[in-house]
Regions:
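Conserved PLP-enzyme active-site core in the AAT-like
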Residues: 1-121, 139, 182-183
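Short helix/loop capping segments that flank catalytic or ligand/cofactor-binding pockets
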Residues: 22, 49, 146, 188-189
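Phosphate/diphosphate-binding loops
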Residues: 37-52, 144, 148-163
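Short acidic (Asp/Glu) and glycine-rich catalytic loops that position anionic groups and cofactors
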Residues: 63-68, 83-92, 127-134, 174-182, ...
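Hydrophobic alpha-helix feature that most strongly marks membrane-spanning transmembrane helices
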Residues: 71, 91, 109, 116, ...
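Intrinsically disordered or highly flexible coil/loop and linker segments, enriched in small
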Residues: 75, 79, 99, 117-121, ...
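Conserved small-domain helix->loop->beta segment predominantly found in fold-type I
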Residues: 90, 101, 105-149, 159-174, ...
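PLP-dependent enzyme catalytic core of the Aspartate aminotransferase-like
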Residues: 106, 171-253
Length: 253
């Protein structure tokens, strides 16, 4: 794409809001190395830092126009405390990101498989369900994404309604899909085994087997032991974490 766009004097600007952490953690391709001129992303989401934005580029010629567009055109000031928090997040990404993001993806695949085995259709099954932190499920026959997201929230399970293939644009407020993510549960030290339990909670509500009020106490009891944030300088890796780096795996081969 970059070669085609360059023929017409254009540049590719890559929106990596959801993928920024996956890119930094080596779980996703690097757009800048593949021809993108600018990469934008969220410092939250998969990057797990303070809520803010990130703009990255590797062409020195873009430095002046981009920085000028930010200040003074779009922003007059910034929060220094957020910059400090982002600096810590970047340092932790360098130290823990590869292992952290790999576990996020493993957990997402484990959760997808758990839901699939329990009769909830999961998009992307022929390709292993997902290569990111997200799992998309088709819940049209169970009441739709909006209704089920609200029912799950009553049981302290936070999901998001999501458009899926065959939905129409006007279905945005009542789509046929649900979007699930594994960022926070992974940061709390959960692994593939816990995804089985989470899958059970979700299916009990989605299938209509139980009312949310009958599940919420089970969710609270399940969540209670997980009170420590991992993949950070304070607490390091969760117990029994596989911490081999890409170089380690390359050396083993």
């Amino acid at each position: 794409m970059s070669e085609i766009v360059a023929e017409w004097g254009g540049r590719i600007f890559y929106d990596g809001a959801h993928q920024a952490g996956l890119i930094a953690g080596g779980q996703f391709q690097d757009p800048l190395r593949e021809g993108a001129a600018v990469l934008t992303g969220s410092a939250g989401k998969t990057f797990s830092g303070p809520q803010s934005g990130i703009i990255v580029w590797n062409d020195p010629a873009l430095t002046e126009p981009i920085t000028h567009a930010i200040f003074p055109v779009l922003a007059a000031t910034h929060q220094v405390n957020r910059v400090a928090a982002l600096a810590v997040s970047v340092a932790e990404m360098l130290a823990f990101g590869e292992v952290y993001l790999a576990q996020i993806v493993r957990n997402a695949r484990a959760l997808a498989a758990a839901l699939d085995r329990r009769g909830i259709p999961v998009l992307g099954k022929p390709k292993g369900y997902t290569s990111t932190h997200q799992v998309i499920v088709d819940v049209r026959r169970f009441g739709g994404g909006n209704e089920l997201a609200q029912r799950l929230a009553t049981a302290n399970i936070i999901t998001n309604k999501n458009l899926i293939p065959e939905d129409r644009p006007e279905d945005w407020d009542s789509p046929g899909g649900l979007r699930l993510g594994t960022i926070e549960v992974t940061r709390l030290g959960m692994g593939e085994a816990e995804m089985e339990a989470i899958g059970d909670f979700i299916v009990r509500i989605v299938s209509g087997q139980d009312r949310p009020e009958a599940v919420v106490n089970d969710v609270v009891e399940f969540r209670e032991p997980f009170q420590t944030l991992y993949y950070c300088f304070e607490n390091g890796f969760p117990p029994n974490t596989v911490t081999a780096t890409a170089q380690d795996r390359k050396d083993q081969r």
